[in-house]
């Protein structure tokens, strides 16, 4: 089996990007170690702090965020970083070539019940000039690499550099990521969907109708039965989609009119959409292809519908969208050019 280093060489990934990917992979090994130790290391439970989204931070949210920050500061290729756990973008090195956006511990609410969590990351080119939040506001099409690390029964890294999606598994004895799937592919058809059904009453009418038709199974207009899956961690639900097909959605809702969307564009939706498209699937907000969105702020949220291409198309048809056309962009609040130097 190829190691991650050997694979990057075989794909002719340039040295600086390979170095950054290996830094992210090595840090994920340390995060995996911290997650496995859990209560033994006293790292479970919540803090009294909130992140910029107003979410209570888990102890491991802060620990894993600091681990990634420290590693990226030492890497030498990184110009700046943006994290779910940082209020503002962070300047790392004036000579860096790359910007890194990440969610250090996706699904951290699962950590206290020993369920799936993971790290999601996106790598963008660093533009010339002064680093501001605007430097990061590039569409998902600009991503040079993206991936996630899933901390489950095995620790797995799913990675794309724009040459398909490869899956690596961390060998428990050698501590090396080994290539275990050279070409992940999402089947166009599926009979599985993932959604938080507790929010059903808050969804827009098209999504309510779509899910209702799935639940009708063979006696409904879809004429086939569907199973529902929900891990409550995007990284776990998307891994299942990449592994065996399906559709994952966190749609628009009016539960909190000030926050109609749940998932963050820059370090959740964009990297996952890049992976899904590279594996033959589709990713949309319901009104626009995710990778085509022009971001307006670093913590911008969007609706997400992604997975098996034919099922995403079916979902979009309920929204009255011709998926061959480009709908109007989904906008958010104005950005603010703020950074922190480290």
Curated annotation (Swiss-Prot):
Family statement drawn from the similarity comment of this UniProt entry: Belongs to the FBPase class 1 family.
The reaction(s) this protein catalyses: beta-D-fructose 1,6-bisphosphate + H2O = beta-D-fructose 6-phosphate + phosphate
InterPro entries cross-referenced by the UniProt entry: FBPase_C_dom, FBPase_class-1, FBPase_N, FBPtase
Keywords for this protein: Carbohydrate metabolism, Cytoplasm, Hydrolase, Magnesium, Metal-binding
Gene3D superfamilies listed in its UniProt record: 3.40.190.80, Fructose-1,6-Bisphosphatase, subunit A, domain 1
Pathway: Carbohydrate biosynthesis; gluconeogenesis
Binding-site list for substrate: 106-109, 196, 262
Chief localisation class: cytoplasm
Gene Ontology cellular component annotations, sorted alphabetically: cytosol
Biological process (GO), any one: sucrose biosynthetic process
Key word Magnesium present: yes
Binding site for Mg(2+) 2: 103, 106, 268
Record note on quaternary structure: Homotetramer.
SUPFAM superfamilies: Carbohydrate phosphatase
Cofactor binding note from Swiss-Prot or TrEMBL: Binds 2 magnesium ions per subunit.
Enzyme class: hydrolase
UniProt entry tagged with the keyword Zinc: no
Cofactor requirements of the protein: Mg(2+)
Listed name of the protein: Fructose-1,6-bisphosphatase class 1
Compartments where located: Cytoplasm
Residues at which Mg(2+) 1 binds: 84, 103, 105
Catalytic activity, EC: 3.1.3.11
GO terms of molecular function: fructose 1,6-bisphosphate 1-phosphatase activity; magnesium ion binding
């Amino acid at each position: 089996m190829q190691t991650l280093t050997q694979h990057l060489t075989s794909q002719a990934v340039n040295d600086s990007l390979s170095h950054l990917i290996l830094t992210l992979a090595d840090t994920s090994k340390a995060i995996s170690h911290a997650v496995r130790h859990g209560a033994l290391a006293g790292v479970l439970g919540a803090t009294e702090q909130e992140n910029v989204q107003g979410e209570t931070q888990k102890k491991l949210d802060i620990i894993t965020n600091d681990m990634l920050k420290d590693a990226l500061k030492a890497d030498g290729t990184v110009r700046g970083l943006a994290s779910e756990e940082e209020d503002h973008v962070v300047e790392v090195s004036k000579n860096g070539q790359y910007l890194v956006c990440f969610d250090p511990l996706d699904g951290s609410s699962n950590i206290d019940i020993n369920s799936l969590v993971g790290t999601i990351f996106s790598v963008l080119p660093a533009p010339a000039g002064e680093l501001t939040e605007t430097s990061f506001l590039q569409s998902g099409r600009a991503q040079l690499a993206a991936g996630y690390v899933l901390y489950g029964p095995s620790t797995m890294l799913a990675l794309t550099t724009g040459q398909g999606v490869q899956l690596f598994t961390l060998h428990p004895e050698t501590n090396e990521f080994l290539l275990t799937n050279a070409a992940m592919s999402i089947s166009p058809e599926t009979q599985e969907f993932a959604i938080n059904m507790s929010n059903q009453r808050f969804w827009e009418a098209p999504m309510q109708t779509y899910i209702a038709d799935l639940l009708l199974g063979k006696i409904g207009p879809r004429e086939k039965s569907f199973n529902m899956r929900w891990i409550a961690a995007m990284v776990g639900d998307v891994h299942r989609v990449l592994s065996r097909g399906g559709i994952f959605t966190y749609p628009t809702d009016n539960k909190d009119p000030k926050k109609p969307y749940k998932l963050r564009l820059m370090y959740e939706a964009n990297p996952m959409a890049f992976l899904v498209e590279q594996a033959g699937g589709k990713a949309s907000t319901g009104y626009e292809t995710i990778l085509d969105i022009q971001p307006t702020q670093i913590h911008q949220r969007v609706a997400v519908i992604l997975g098996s291409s034919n099922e995403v198309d079916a979902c979009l048809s309920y929204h009255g969208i011709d998926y061959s056309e480009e709908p109007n962009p989904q906008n958010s609040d104005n950005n603010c050019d703020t950074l922190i130097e480290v």
